Amino acid sequence: MYDAFAVISWSAAGIEPSVISILWSEAVAAEVVVFFLIGPALLHRFGARGAAALAAVAGTVRWSVAGVTTSVLTLSILQPLHGLTFALLHLASMRMMQTLVPVGLAGTGQAIYAFGSGCLTAMLTLLSGVLYAKFGGAAFLLMALLCAVALPLAWFGFADERDRSALL
C-alpha cells in the first residue's frame, strides 16, 4: 500500500503533488539517516531481534495513524518512521543473514532474500489495488495489522548473535 497507494490516497485528499514529494523525500531522508547513522547503533544495542521488533512497532504506529488521517502535519510526523520500518528492518535482516548463512553462501542468501521480498511486495501491491478500491485510505490499516503480526515473528524468529550457538 505504502508507495503508489499513499500517493493516490493523499492526492484524493487534496494534498498538492509538491507536498506529497516533500513527504516522500522526508521518508527517504530518514531511511538514509538510519542506514548510515543511527541504524548501526540501534542494531548494536538491541541486536537483530530488538531491531526487527522496533521496526514492527514503528510500522504498526505509522500505518495505524496513516489509515485514519490525511493531515499533512500528522503525515510529516509519521514519514520518518520509514527509516525504522524499512532501513532498520533491512539492517536486522542482513545481520541475521550474516549470523546464520555461511560466508560461502552469502550471495545465495541475499538472492533468496531479495527474491522473496520482491515477490511478496508484488503480491501485496496487487492485493493493495483491490483493498484500496474497496476501502480507500482505510486499507492502510491492513498494513498496520501485518506489522502487528510481524512483532512476535520478529521477536521469536530473529535470533541475536549471542543466540547463534543455540541455533546451530
Identify the residue ranges that each predicted region occupies:
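Helix-loop boundary and gating motifs at the non-cytosolic
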Residues: 1-23
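Helix-to-loop junctions at the C-terminal end of transmembrane segments
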Residues: 34-47, 132
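Intracellular juxtamembrane helix-capping segments at the cytosolic ends
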Residues: 88-101
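A membrane-interface helix-boundary motif in multi-pass transporters
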Residues: 130-149
